[in-house]
Every structure is written in structure tokens, then in C-alpha cells.
Amino acid sequence: MRLFVAALGLLCAGSTVASAGDLAAGEKVFRKCATCHTVGPKAKNKVGPILNGVVGRPWGAIEGFKYSQGGEGTLLAINEAAPKTWDVQTLTAYLHNPKEVIPKGKMAFTGLPKDKDIENLIFYLAQFDADGNQVDPATVVEQSAN
């Protein structure tokens, strides 16, 4: 019985660590994104929208950023048909293959092949609220995953 309880404890501890992500590794992955996107209190739209508060944010919600124009398969059309939120599941799919999620979106990035890089990037982005202030990323990820 003690062995079962110990094994269960290790299993639970392992899953918590795996879902938490690594901020330093996520920041390193974000460097690929930083050409077009910014985060933090002084973030500004560039080629891509600012990513403050992206985890849990509705699609197309950054004022002043020109998203892909309407038409089948674009962000605007998808929003009108079925409003979406950038939750963990949607972000994971998008970061793996952006064109699969938004076929006619204007983001040129082809995606991240490694699941761990995606997990770490989402965790890194989750630390920024809508104003770019730092918050607990684990709480944001947990709320977004539910």
C-alpha cells in the first residue's frame, strides 16, 4: 500500500511540473517570435499584435492591430462564425501549425515542432497580463486550460 501511495505521489508531482513549463526556456523560444511580437509594459504592435494577456484572450482583440481581412479561413471569418479564445489547447494547435488553425491568416511563421517548446512558450506568455504586468503564469495556464 505504501508503494502505491508513493507511486501516486510521484505521478502527481511529475504532472504538475510538466504542466508548469519553464520560463527561461519559454523566453528563449519567444526570441523567434520577438521579430514580429512584443510583450511587457512597453509592448507595441509590430508586424504582429502585442502578446500581453494572450493566454485566455479572445481572438482578434487587440485594438489598433489590423488582423487578416474577412474571407473564408481568416481570423475575422472564424470569429464571426464561432468566437474563439486563445486558450492553452487553441494556442498549442496554433503554435504547432498556424495555417491549420487559421488557413488564410497573415502570420508567416510555420510553427514549432517540439511540444515542450510550445508548452514553455505558452507558460512564458502567460506571465504577462493585458497591461504587460507580470502575474503568476501557472494560475493563468490552469484557468485557461479549464
Residue positions per predicted region:
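The canonical Cys-X-X-Cys-His
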Residues: 30-39, 121, 125
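Sec-dependent N-terminal signal peptides
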Residues: 3-15
